[in-house]
Amino acid sequence: MIDILPAFWAVIPAAGVGARMAADRPKQYLELAGQTLLEHSLDCFLGHPALKGVVVSIAEDDPYWPGLRCASDPRIHCAAGGRERADSVLNALLVLHAQGAADSDWVLVHDAARPNLARSDLDKLLSELADDPVGGLLAVPARDTLKRADSHGRVSATVDRSTIWQAYTPQMFRLGALHRALAECLVSDVVVTDEASAIEWSGQAPRLVEGRSDNIKVTRPEDLEWLRQRWAGKR
């Protein structure tokens, strides 16, 4: 690990609808401890001295973003949300280029509904990847026994978990390399669910940096309830 952390840009794709939450609004705008999930997800970056700027990708008809206090922060720029996550991130990278970012600059992509990122995890990621030739991501080793299912919903095998990790965010890559990888995936109709997948498809191996298991992504109602109870206990 190094003492001087590298400067970085952050990208938050926030154009999704979060259908599994069955809420009255996209999940990134649900409330947690007086702020939206998106605001909490931004806070860890906005409070970091090495931040150069943030791009948030939002849906064209998003009625919620303009009402957030952080929407007027001069460090935050907006990009058009796309049909898929990869489209939204690629649009954000184009905005970074327009802001003068270089291909060699580090970009950290973070989920809009992952509000519990610890500053210590962010610093660890920046420190451990500062000189890495590829980049990498926060991740957590699998803890539970994993089962592979057949087409009838029955167990077909028990998976060796010793080499299995859960991919978290932020995911940290050089701007130019990430731009090329995502663009190539879109042209080739390759479906990627995170930025590391695109880098992998380009033939590179991202590094896994172990983070905290409580850096969860809110996907279902019980995730948000768990965070509310946890945060209430901190007060």
Swiss-Prot record:
The keyword Metal-binding does not apply. It comes from the Bacteria. One of its GO terms (molecular function) is 2-C-methyl-D-erythritol 4-phosphate cytidylyltransferase activity. It comes from Pseudomonas putida (strain ATCC 47054 / DSM 6125 / CFBP 8728 / NCIMB 11950 / KT2440). The record marks R20, K27 as: Transition state stabilizer. Its EC number is 2.7.7.60. It catalyses: 2-C-methyl-D-erythritol 4-phosphate + CTP + H(+) = 4-CDP-2-C-methyl-D-erythritol + diphosphate. This is 2-C-methyl-D-erythritol 4-phosphate cytidylyltransferase. It holds the Pfam family IspD. NCBIfam families: ispD (TIGR00453). Keywords: Isoprene biosynthesis, Nucleotidyltransferase, Transferase. Catalyzes the formation of 4-diphosphocytidyl-2-C-methyl-D-erythritol from CTP and 2-C-methyl-D-erythritol 4-phosphate (MEP). GO terms for biological process: isopentenyl diphosphate biosynthetic process, methylerythritol 4-phosphate pathway. HAMAP family: IspD (MF_00108). Belongs to the IspD/TarI cytidylyltransferase family. IspD subfamily. The record marks R161, K217 as: Positions MEP for the nucleophilic attack. Pathway: Isoprenoid biosynthesis; isopentenyl diphosphate biosynthesis via DXP pathway; isopentenyl diphosphate from 1-deoxy-D-xylulose 5-phosphate: step 2/6.
